[in-house]
């Protein structure tokens, strides 16, 4: 978020939540700050209003009461001021504004915080104070802003997302990042306040015992004016920035938190009880994050990560991911040699089918996607349209003229499975077959669901498993191409070629070795993550 702001050409930058409503005094305060003659950072908390009692008139220029009477600006200010005394302002709905955006806000390295998941705003303010390059002040008493109470509980207006307060792992991750970077957990402070009294902007020191009026040089104030200003300061001192600063002796939550698969599923799943699952080890952590960043950009929040090792588990928490650890995952996973066909690959892939089966039995549909599958569009609406008793899977067939359901051409790195009796029974057979096989799970999928040698094939794009009556639908390769189909990865502009075909995804497979896979995806511009900054790009 901060990087995006710095990319703009502007005299003043403002970072705020889109649900926040600003009144005209915000512009007045900015104009005053702009004339300070030094670099500054303005911060202000917004007030929560459970129900806004006014409505727009037909011109959409004025608010009016139910009786049609126009609401004046001072009435709105009074309502906000009274409400601020009755409820806490929201740190997540804070407004931050600063000048000279070419100069950094602080001297530290910004952690990969998830915006609006706690700690971020406190960290920015603390580091700006520590850096001492800017004058940091609290303008809460001067700026009138509010948000509706229900807006605080909305993560996204899509029905496919859950409320942020349930996504506790994101707050825990931010808290730990705040401890690892900077000095937030080693100091506390209060900010000087900007007030407007007797039509004058003045700064009041943070000390409760004295008021330091910042009056321009060469000007003096009469006794009556000073009396009015003192009374104004007394009235407004209660309105100030409200942040949950961590005290020096306060301990942060443990990095391991009580979320297992069963507890994460209802928090992450969309309204159709569907989750997107990926399984990853530490060697693929950067590719995992590129995959996550892409899903976030596509506004697909209902994903889960199964960590194969403790390093991936902790890394995922710090990145704000909904992650669970598989205690039965194979140990000693090779860092560079866990590619297709290797013994390591064979052991790792069997974790995926076991996990999918467990999720299906818990009553949730699963889209299993390897992290090397690049998403151009959200495929869930299409995949869910296949209906019950259908497992939709990518085809690994590269020959453009051959049937896409040829033997051993079912790709177990991208498929959609419903939580219904035929699918669960068929997946149990796949897991049982893979457990006794010396190969990866991929041959077990085909031999079980399509029969050895393709005995259960139906036409050129389907199979029907006779005992469970499950239909396997091989996905159109124009929309779901594998890594060898149409030589797409050899095109100069892979993205343009895929978008021309209206691809949903492109699998980065049919290439051996982790480093080659990473290089190809980065060089072709299908990479969404900056590993040096641990942030999405």
Curated annotation (Swiss-Prot):
<dbReference type="GO" id="GO:0016757">
    <property type="term" value="F:glycosyltransferase activity"/>
</dbReference>
<dbReference type="Pfam" id="PF03407">
    <property type="entry name" value="Nucleotid_trans"/>
</dbReference>
<dbReference type="InterPro" id="IPR044575">
    <property type="entry name" value="RAY1-like"/>
</dbReference>
<keyword id="KW-0808">Transferase</keyword>
<keyword id="KW-0961">Cell wall biogenesis/degradation</keyword>
<protein>
    <recommendedName>
        <fullName>Beta-arabinofuranosyltransferase RAY1</fullName>
        <ecNumber>2.4.2.-</ecNumber>
    </recommendedName>
</protein>
<keyword id="KW-0328">Glycosyltransferase</keyword>
<dbReference type="InterPro" id="IPR005069">
    <property type="entry name" value="Nucl-diP-sugar_transferase"/>
</dbReference>
<comment type="function">
    <text>Beta-arabinofuranosyltransferase that transfers specifically an arabinosyl residue from UDP-arabinofuranose to the monosaccharide galactose or beta-methyl-galactoside in vitro. Catalyzes the addition of a beta-arabinofuranose residue onto a beta-galactosyl residue of an Yariv-precipitable wall polymer in vivo.</text>
</comment>
<dbReference type="GO" id="GO:0005794">
    <property type="term" value="C:Golgi apparatus"/>
</dbReference>
<feature type="short sequence motif" description="DXD motif">
    <location>
        <begin position="370"/>
        <end position="372"/>
    </location>
</feature>
<dbReference type="GO" id="GO:0042546">
    <property type="term" value="P:cell wall biogenesis"/>
</dbReference>
<dbReference type="GO" id="GO:0071555">
    <property type="term" value="P:cell wall organization"/>
</dbReference>
<comment type="similarity">
    <text>Belongs to the glycosyltransferase 77 family.</text>
</comment>
